Amino acid sequence: AIIEMLVPPNSGPVPHKHTQFQECFYVLEGEVEMQTREGKQTAKQGDLVHIPLDGPVHCFKNNASQNARLLCIVAPSGLDTFFEEVGRKIPAGTVPESVPPTPEQIAFANQTAEKYGQKLYPKDYFDK
């Protein structure tokens, strides 16, 4: 699956791990800070980041003041279906308001992630 991601400033996913697919991020616009236990790396426009099958716990964040746009490529597919199940649809070409998830939304995402071979970790996972 190929997923276009629009990442607003100061946002990104919580640390997570995929056990059933590999993932690549290609930065189309802007930049994101990728993080694993090994450290942080800034991925800029034109950069490609690969997370292998059953790779490390990872996350990314857009620390810039403008949106970042990424292509997320996963094989085999499944992450796209996860996003359809836990996300909300927005009109094409619009930027969703960045609103923190409710405890109920977090619980639903954690439960649903397991069904798709993912494990989500607390946002402070790398601070420990």
Question: Which role does the model predict for each range below?
Answer:
Residues 86-128:
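Acidic/histidine-enriched, glycine/proline-rich intrinsically disordered or flexible terminal extensions
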Residues 20-32, 37-38:
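Glycine- and acidic-residue-biased ligand/ion/polar-headgroup-sensing regions
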Residues 31, 38-55:
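Short acidic-glycine-tyrosine-enriched beta hairpin
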Residues 1-15, 21:
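A short glycine-rich, His/Asp/Glu-containing loop-to-beta-strand
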